[in-house]
Amino acid sequence: MFNPKKIYKVARKLNKTIVFPEASFSERIVEAGKIIRDKKIANVIFVGDESNLILKYKNLKNITIINPKTSDIRQEIEDLIFEKRQAKGITRKKARELSYDPIYFATMLVEMGIADGMVAGAETATSDSLRPALQLIKGKDEGYVSSCNIIFGKHKVLGKERTLVIGDSGLN
């Protein structure tokens, strides 16, 4: 039987960091990040403009916010994108453009080890969420791509506090 408390306990012990590139344009993502922070499931990074996020949402304490436009590591991300995609014909200009894109920026945070994982696709097409990872993160023999929805909270139909995990079987 599925036991979310066991998953939370393991996640807390692992102390991983998850980046949310859609925070600047999705209230659902911000709320999910806050729940993860509050339940101490993982450390949370939002990609977006800090001043806009703080003005729009309350209680973002203990959430790291990184703005690709002003980040100290944006140039490094641009350089890495260019290096990784140069053989495929990417130009320096295109690498720069992609380094400002929240999904590409967050993907590179994972590739660089700043984050351990990324949650995307709530507001962005699956193809646009996966493309950067498939292009930029070197695959490993034991690695895989997974899609899963975890829903916290009181469900309208179920009527009580529940955690639901729903897999996306379209991604294998």
Predicted regions and their residues:
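Anion-binding alpha/beta catalytic cores of soluble intermediary-metabolism enzymes, centered on
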Residues: 1-172
